[in-house]
Amino acid sequence: MKPAPDLSPFNGTVIRLKESPLISAERFPPESIPGLPADALANINGPSVLRMPDWAPGKQSALHLYFGHHKGDSIRLAFSDRLEGPWKMWTDPILPLAESLFLSTDPSPDPSIPEPDWVDALDGDYLYAHVASPDVHIDEAHQRLVMYYHGLLPGGDQQTRLATSTDGINFKPREPLLGPPYFRATKLDGMIYLSMWEGRLGRTRSWEGPIDLAPKELLPDDITGAPDRQIRHGHVFAHQGRLHLTFSRIGDAPERLLYCELKPAEAWSDW
């Protein structure tokens, strides 16, 4: 990747709507929602908010918010006509862990299986069955919703799968494994671009893949913070012919959101 000092900066404004999260235990006491674990709203990562199309028969309000606990057993749904709320909770999971095609119970350590290369960054806390980080998009061409989500594999690796829905309520998972966890997608000039765990980037022309993964070293150290830091959670969006990446890093204290712009090219080396 080459620096491009001639790129004009993106001038935008980020407005925090409220002091408290849209989804929290204070707003939705767990005991008021059947089957919701006590801590289900305490550790949410990677929610998706989208304006629902009129063709979706499961549309509850103008906005659907899909979310899950970072170590949770389901993907959930809240809905509202306004971003500021009030939000209501759909009582049933839209994708339970048991139906996710990932491990549904915590595995025991197996010395014969090598640990994933990212385990050191998590202090060994990784053998927990979960389904998390839904990234939901509208596929107008096929009148469906597509959702990237991740879970645990035997041996401790975490990977991403795709689930689809024609109503916005019932999602059907697909078997193929697409790549690392924490997919975030955006479309630009007919291509779907992806950010993932550790700041990995990818691209595909179909929601189902296959995914063309960028080299791990694509992002320079002054962005990733290597070797002392590591990109953890990122989000990518397209605007004015460029990709805009926001992310946090393991090792930053205090933890913060960072931002960079990317100008895509056909060859990864020309980015």
Regions found by a protein language model. Give the residues of each.
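Beta-rich carbohydrate-recognition and catalytic domains
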Residues: M1-S133, H137-R232, A238-W271
